[in-house]
Amino acid sequence: MVNTLANELREGTTKSHSMAENVSFVKSFLGGVVDKKSYRKLVANLYFVYCAIEEELFSNKNHPAIKPIYFTELNRKASLSEDLNYYYGSDWLDFIEPSPATKIYVDRIHTIGHKQPELLVAHAYTRYLGDLSGGQILKKIARGAMNLSDSGGTKFYDFDQIKDDKLFKDQYRAALDMIPLSDVQIQNIVSEANISFTLNMKMFEELNSSSLKIITMLIANTIQKFKAKYKSTLAMVD
């Protein structure tokens, strides 16, 4: 296999990706247990993260390492703003602030944006490709777990300007391989991608619910699924 940036990032972050999926909050989320209070805190934290990423990408959009992967259709700030308006109301900015882990994450993005812009590639790759890859599944889980009846609250997962996720991801990976980088720079970007995963994990860990709360929600979730299955069975009998 050719040692391209896209391949190096995929292979070099496999362990970090697995670790991130095993953080308690993420495992609960994937299992269909989503606490609305924790979820809206996550949305708020992601708002600050994406504001930082998108500010630095814009500032460095003509940098040789950023220009090939600068796609404004990926921007999440506006969609996160819609979600925050849904959960907190029109004055949502008065109610949110970055958590301690989020502040560290945001500071990291601004620091490399000013000093080593090529490392922004790692953060863009980690967040945006992750959002595109699992977004629709996570959206379905979130809507079902929080019993969201209308279309609000999960705009973050909607990429309205991207018609074909798979085609776009292929385009993005091809763009990664167009970036003029030395072998050392490629390894630095892979290392930064692992740092990005760690920063995300720290942010998720702050959102962990208590064990009792998780167990209670799991039981409630199981009961709801059983009731739905029971009703479906009765309907078939009738």
Curated annotation (Swiss-Prot):
Alphabetized InterPro entries for the sequence: Haem_Oase (IPR002051), Haem_Oase-like (IPR016053), Haem_Oase-like_multi-hlx (IPR016084), Haem_oxygenase_CS (IPR018207)
Compartments reported by the entry: Plastid, Chloroplast
Catalytic reactions on record: heme b + 3 reduced [NADPH--hemoprotein reductase] + 3 O2 = biliverdin IXalpha + CO + Fe(2+) + 3 oxidized [NADPH--hemoprotein reductase] + 3 H2O + H(+)
Protein name per its UniProtKB record: Heme oxygenase
Naturally occurring in which organism (per UniProt): Pyropia yezoensis (Susabi-nori)
Function: Catalyzes the opening of the heme ring with the release of iron. Key enzyme in the synthesis of the chromophoric part of the photosynthetic antennae.
One term of GO molecular function: heme oxygenase (decyclizing) activity
Pfam families: Heme_oxygenase
UniProt-listed CDD domains: HemeO (cd19165)
Family of this protein: Belongs to the heme oxygenase family.
UniProt keywords, alphabetically: Chloroplast, Heme, Iron, Metal-binding, Oxidoreductase, Photosynthesis, Plastid
EC number: 1.14.14.18
GO cellular component assignments: chloroplast
